[in-house]
Curated annotation (Swiss-Prot):
Domain of life of the source: Bacteria
Entry PTM: Binds 2 heme c groups covalently per subunit.
Protein known as: Cytochrome bc1 complex cytochrome c subunit
Subunit and interaction comment: The cytochrome bc1 complex is composed of a cytochrome b (QcrB), the Rieske iron-sulfur protein (QcrA) and a diheme cytochrome c (QcrC) subunit. The bc1 complex forms a supercomplex with cytochrome c oxidase (cytochrome aa3).
Binding site for heme c 1: 65, 68-69
Transmembrane segments: 17-37, 259-279
A Pfam family recorded for this sequence: Cytochrome_CBB3
EC number(s) on file: 7.1.1.8
Amino acid sequence: MTNAKKVRARRKIRRTAAGAMALAVGLTGAGILVNAVTPDAQVATAQQDEQALIQEGKDLYDVACITCHGANLQGVKDRGPSLIGVGSGATYFQVHSGRMPMLRNEAQAKRKTPRYSEAQTLAIAAYVEANGGGPSIVYNKDGSVAMESLRGANYKDGIDPADVARGSDLFRLNCASCHNFTGRGGALSSGKYAPVLDPANEQEIYQAMLTGPQNMPKFSDRQLSADEKKDIIAYIKSAKETPSQGGWNLGGLGPVTEGMMMWLVGIVVLVAAAMWIGSRS
């Protein structure tokens, strides 16, 4: 009897251990399976943040843009074009530079103090891009909007002179005919004009080249590569920030203002000299 009891006890212990082992294996397997099919927390959070940003952009759009561009971004005849497919880049340029919303319909939207903050501008841009895609804002690796990193293909703690040299050639070939060779802007036809480039930040200049706002032609990456666009920005910023070696630059408009100033000063000097000679005789 004693041996039989011992055998039954050992069998009971083995069954209990086997059951516990099976339960542990089952729970472990279930945990692994759940972990495999459950979205990563960071990805889910990022998606939620993106959706919240798009919703914020839609709310802002419905207040300020819907009248001219339509409830579905399809545009409204004689008011505003469709925004489907324009992307976040074009939206950033127009809103961040204050050109949109426009004060009134005119030949060309003028730069003015922006109505919306940087964060609100990015929200509107995210909403527009979510509806049709298009050229995107350039971001740094840390998620911030690229600014100084666009100052030349080889920018690192400062503008590379080689980038400025290449950018100067590219600017002269593609931009100077309208914007003047130092980015001072100039008059066009029908009341339009090429704006001064000084107030524009790096992202605005990049997006202007990429998307071609208003009267400006588009420069796709096939016409001007991303690095070439950056080199042009390097030249523009270098021209703005480098002091004039000759003193007062007369607005940086080149031979027109310089020639006029020389002519006016020369005439005044000649008239004064003639009057002085006449008074002496």
